[in-house]
């Protein structure tokens, strides 16, 4: 495994949606998620991490060290069993093996981190190991992300659609078309903030510089292999990276996030934004604390 990263990072992702549903809420008929008090649109961290996993799986294709643990339709205990097999352990013998080898917990954790990119990055709860009373069942990952929130309120719209195809023979006799509906956000610019702990990378998962570059690549291409009619047009517009010159960091994260401002290109224009060109993104680099540098990727 490569050497773990040595610097703490924070980052800001700015992405937008045009005539699409960035993250439907199953409790609200799959409407776009909205903060009911402010009208600001929301996209969950789980949604964004899923897209990062999907990108890595697409470009790495299960290459050694870059497999994905949390996959659609794949039982987690199937991957857990691989760790047992690699260390010559079974569910029946695990407790006896643990008495023989006090480092068994760490060995299993290290094997999972070395083989699965998303565990090394985001951490995981591995139920098989929790049930076996192993301390490696919960791994806290060095990369953490919050909810994305739109810069301005969004107004989701319900669009009625028709379908010429008929489902049953009875429907064919009674009607010519079927009705459906879909939800869209006409336009929204979303901001997500994230954190990368070099301390956790060193102590726990071994998240490396190579992993870090893959993470940045995945974020910049978050929606490039995820297009669908439901999501409309989505794109990552900017990735703003703050790098500390130490493992534990040189300043609180909120002070760095506060240097990133998103304002209207024409402040006097009160009409709803409909494109990225309606906004201006600035970073007050002069206000950055000593020991912190900023990089902007697009």
Regions found by a protein language model. Name each.
Residues 1-298:
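RNA-binding basic/glycine-rich loop and surface signature characteristic of RAMP-family CRISPR effectors
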